[in-house]
């Protein structure tokens, strides 16, 4: 039973007695399949970005943020440590999807994240782009998204957490 989350962790995230495997990054792979109630998979996310308008729920497991940015239970469940962010980017499925959907975002005929996402999701997207831009060393598709939609300005809270000055 060690490969499953303990019951107290399941209770914290509202999934008591559901056998969610605690393999590295499993929560993102499961999320991106679209099997979670009221959430949609990666294919839906990509189609929505290509159409220029996010309409359903999927941002947490497609564009994760650094742990410590929020107290929202779902967002924090999908938040990543620096180690997990590096593993996410290097993962053959998750990393390639993150690059693919970020590239698709560059092709959207808009220059305002709020016109593509809601205001709150625009903040989440900027935080995720900041995280993955920094761990990829900059000069990446993530920097291009920041340049196009955020005037090149990274999320200061993400940077402070990554720099160790905000916990």
Predicted features along the sequence, with ranges:
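A charged, amphipathic interaction segment
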Residues: 99-167
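Conserved, aromatic- and glycine-enriched, well-ordered alpha/beta core segments
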Residues: 4-123
